[in-house]
Amino acid sequence: DPKVQIICETMGGLKPAYEFTKRALMSGKSVCTSNKELVATHGPELIQIAHEHTCNYLFEASVGGGIPIIRPLNYSLTAEKIDAISGILNGTTNYILTKMEREGAAFEEVLKEAQEKGYAERNPEADVEGYDACRKIAILSSLMCGKNVRYQDIYTEGITKITADDFKYAKVMDCTIKLLGLAKEENGGLYAMVSPFLISKSHPLSMVNDVFNAVCVHGNMLGDSMYYGRGAGKLPTASAVVSDVVDCARHIGKIITCFWDAEDVKLTNVDEVERAFFVRVEKAKEQKAKEIFGDVKEITAGVDGEFAFVTGRMSEKEFNEKAEKVGVISRIRL
């Protein structure tokens, strides 16, 4: 239909959304989408097709629901050299972690409640294993560096191993636990990951609770900026889709700039990244842990039969080698 100039795609998944979107763009019709899986998988290809046919492929709703983050990266922050993006990108997992912290409840118990309230899918794997957040940080990190970050290359870890005891320790440390999507330029390379992190209560992301999302962006001139709001739900998502429709309508016959090249980025192996770790081991292994990890900071939270501590900074590879020698109950990154 030549009268149709803008199409909204909210069906989700790759099939048949990919073919429908491609055909629409090749017909010169702009497409506005909330489909993070499609954007993360075929984003640069679809953007290129759109521009070749003087139309646009916009995807504000694919990350952060109604939070404006794609447009700021493409427009407001174009003068910045962005070197880090981190955020709470999944409302389901943030709701679960918030409830676990407030009520001291187990993961399975809170997940069941979240499913009953409609905050979690019947099959919650994409959320709780971090796959949803992985696709979102792939999109954001691609826009950050201007090249294609494949979500398949991003180290991804979910929240299924987080326990109520972890939150007891976090409280003593004046921290909380959040599932973060993280992309950072470091030592001439770029690494990206999704994982639970212990973050200080003084950090702005620590105050993002329930189904809310937030994204922190660090630039060379502006420094830190943060984008916060409802990251899921039909109305916030609809708000973002409609904002893209309006943008397309304002640019009929014109190309809206998007810095996302098809060239794949080779990510730095997370094994090389250095950080500190919070570790729990059996009490009987206390001396062995001290011998292997060296100078550690003990954390006491009234959990029987355990020795918990924070390591010094070390690479992920070094930590994993030491943890294997000791046999840890769990670890959380700082």
Cite the ranges covered by each PLM segment.
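Rossmann-fold NAD(P)-binding glycine/threonine-rich loop
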Residues: 11-27, 34-75
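N-terminal Rossmann-like NAD(P) cofactor-binding module of classical short-chain dehydrogenase/reductase
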Residues: 5-8
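Catalytic, metal-anchored helix/loop core of enzyme active sites in primary metabolism
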Residues: 84-86, 94-97, 113, 119-125, ...
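A conserved regulatory-domain signal marking ACT and ACT-like small-molecule sensing domains
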Residues: 245-334
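Conserved active-site and cofactor/substrate-binding residues in soluble primary-metabolism enzymes
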Residues: 2, 41, 64, 68, ...
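Short glycine-rich anion-binding loops that position phosphate/pyrophosphate groups of nucleotides
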Residues: 12-14, 90, 199
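Substrate-binding/catalytic subdomain of NAD(P)-dependent oxidoreductase enzymes
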Residues: 111-207, 212-214, 233
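Rossmann-like NAD(P)H-binding beta-loop-alpha module
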Residues: 51-132, 139
